[in-house]
Amino acid sequence: MAASDITVSGLNKVGAEDAAYLVSKIRTIPGFPKEGILFRDFMPVLADARAFGILMGALEAALPVDVDDFDMVVGLEARGFLFGPALAARLGKGFIAVRKAGKLPPETMSQSYDLEYGQASMEIETNVVHEGVRVLIVDDLIATGGTANAARSLIEKCGGVVAGFSFVMELTGIDGMKSLGDYPTSSLVCMPA
């Protein structure tokens, strides 16, 4: 992948050297989980204290809405669980997990969605989102927008309000961000799918 294929405008508040360092820790694995997919691996970012610190500072600096415009952070399984709780703690907010189907005790609500490589379903506990609670949905990446839109639907079914979406990476050429409509969004790094 050429460096010119990577856009790091969401990292503009961390400086060019830190942005380059962070991007250098993101691996690209062709053909995983199936042929034709370019998997973007963030695990090396988490294993590197400097890169993880840069990432969390950048997520906080690039919020798509003011910190007072939401009450809770929602993280999507699985890698949204890595960044969502850390961001929530930095911001003094609570955290809500949206999980794969069958992983939460009753009572739950579920929503099916399409992945770039298949179909799946996710759930939320009905007692964690209350009427009118405003949330920021956080995930590691947006591709088709299926997961993010399913989470939005779950929050709204529970009576919550989605204030915005924050992603570490956006895969371009798939129009996932467009699928979110007029919601405020942010992404730190854009790479071609």
Curated annotation (Swiss-Prot):
One of its GO terms (biological process) is AMP salvage. SUPFAM superfamilies: PRTase-like (SSF53271). Homodimer. It is an enzyme of class 2 (transferase). Catalyzes a salvage reaction resulting in the formation of AMP, that is energically less costly than de novo synthesis. The keyword Endoplasmic reticulum does not apply. This is Adenine phosphoribosyltransferase. InterPro entries: Ade_phspho_trans, PRibTrfase_dom, PRTase-like, UPRTase/APRTase. Pathway: Purine metabolism; AMP biosynthesis via salvage pathway; AMP from adenine: step 1/1. GO terms for cellular component: cytoplasm. Its main location: cytoplasm. Belongs to the purine/pyrimidine phosphoribosyltransferase family. It is found in: Cytoplasm. GO terms for molecular function: adenine binding; adenine phosphoribosyltransferase activity; AMP binding. It catalyses: AMP + diphosphate = 5-phospho-alpha-D-ribose 1-diphosphate + adenine. It comes from the Bacteria. Its EC number is 2.4.2.7. Keywords: Cytoplasm, Glycosyltransferase, Purine salvage, Transferase. Pfam families: Pribosyltran. HAMAP family: Aden_phosphoribosyltr. It comes from Bifidobacterium adolescentis (strain ATCC 15703 / DSM 20083 / NCTC 11814 / E194a). PROSITE patterns: PUR_PYR_PR_TRANSFER.
